[in-house]
Amino acid sequence: MMHFELLRDRGILLVTPDGPLEKSDFARLAKEVDPFIASNGRLAGLMIRTKSFPGWESLSALVSHFRFVADHHRKIARIAVVTDSELLKILPRIADHFVKAEIRQFGFDRKDDALAWLEL
C-alpha cells in the first residue's frame, strides 16, 4: 500500500510506501496526478520516501507500477529517492537509463534537503 500527497502549490508529489504495492495504488495515484499534469504540463518533482522497498503484492501490481512509470516519467522533472535502503540507493543509477527525469538519492533523514532539491 502507498500513501501520497500532491503539493499542488509546488507541483510536487510525495509518495510513501508502507506495505507491498498494490495494483489499486497506481490507479489512485494516476487519478490524483493526471488532472494536475493535464492542467500544468508536468510535475516539478516526485519524492519517494521509505525505509525499505516493500515489494509488490502481485504480478499485476508490478505491471501497473511499470505502466505508471512508462506513462509518467517524461512528465516529471526530478525524482528524489529518500531512503537508507541499500537496494533503493542504487535505483537512481539504474533508472537513469530508462527514465527521463533527473534522479537523486537522499538519506532517509534528509527529507527537507530532498524537498529543497525538488523545488530548484
For each predicted feature, which ranges?
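Amphipathic, Lys/Arg-enriched alpha-helical "gate/interface" segment within cytosolic domains
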Residues: 1-120
